[in-house]
Swiss-Prot record:
<dbReference type="GO" id="GO:0003735">
    <property type="term" value="F:structural constituent of ribosome"/>
</dbReference>
<comment type="function">
    <text>This is one of the proteins that bind and probably mediate the attachment of the 5S RNA into the large ribosomal subunit, where it forms part of the central protuberance.</text>
</comment>
<comment type="similarity">
    <text>Belongs to the universal ribosomal protein uL18 family.</text>
</comment>
<protein>
    <recommendedName>
        <fullName>Large ribosomal subunit protein uL18</fullName>
    </recommendedName>
</protein>
<dbReference type="Pfam" id="PF17144">
    <property type="entry name" value="Ribosomal_L5e"/>
</dbReference>
<dbReference type="GO" id="GO:0022625">
    <property type="term" value="C:cytosolic large ribosomal subunit"/>
</dbReference>
<keyword id="KW-0694">RNA-binding</keyword>
<keyword id="KW-0689">Ribosomal protein</keyword>
<keyword id="KW-0687">Ribonucleoprotein</keyword>
<dbReference type="GO" id="GO:0008097">
    <property type="term" value="F:5S rRNA binding"/>
</dbReference>
<dbReference type="GO" id="GO:0000027">
    <property type="term" value="P:ribosomal large subunit assembly"/>
</dbReference>
<keyword id="KW-0699">rRNA-binding</keyword>
<dbReference type="GO" id="GO:0006412">
    <property type="term" value="P:translation"/>
</dbReference>
<comment type="subunit">
    <text>Part of the 50S ribosomal subunit. Contacts the 5S and 23S rRNAs.</text>
</comment>
<dbReference type="InterPro" id="IPR005485">
    <property type="entry name" value="Rbsml_uL18_euk"/>
</dbReference>
Amino acid sequence: MATGPRYKVPFRRRREGRTNYHLRLKLLISKQDRVVVRKSARNVQIQLIAPTPEGDITYSSAVSSELAKYGYTGVTGNTTAAYLTGLLFGLKSLKKGYEGGILDIGLQASSAGSRVYAALKGIVDSGFEVPCSPEVFPSDERIRGEHIAEYREESSDLPEQFEATKEKIFAEFS
């Protein structure tokens, strides 16, 4: 508990485990738009956010649940859906006239081949400029969902569905 005159109470969002203020300060000082990737068990959310003195402004966003509009019926929380959501986000942002940003993964652990980097690969493949190293991207087999098709054996058409959804997304924005 806060006892004594020298005890410093952390900011509320830091206490809740929601904000890393040291990283946020570095991102704000760069004065570049942030590409914010957040994942949950069921979805992946991507936003293009610009910092202002009044508060952050969201310019563009995509959520993996939007993939249903393009015929994707698979699980929206996996690596395949993360890539497709990144692709959708990148094409939406380019259509609105934005060209790039820097990646912000917040308090999520950075591990190569994760859903965060699958989303980043989709963003980069769309032509949206985000500085990154290709070494962190998951393999193309994982992005297409071949590991899921191999595991499920009998009824997984995920790689074919991935290609069809990818073509529909490109068709809408070309």
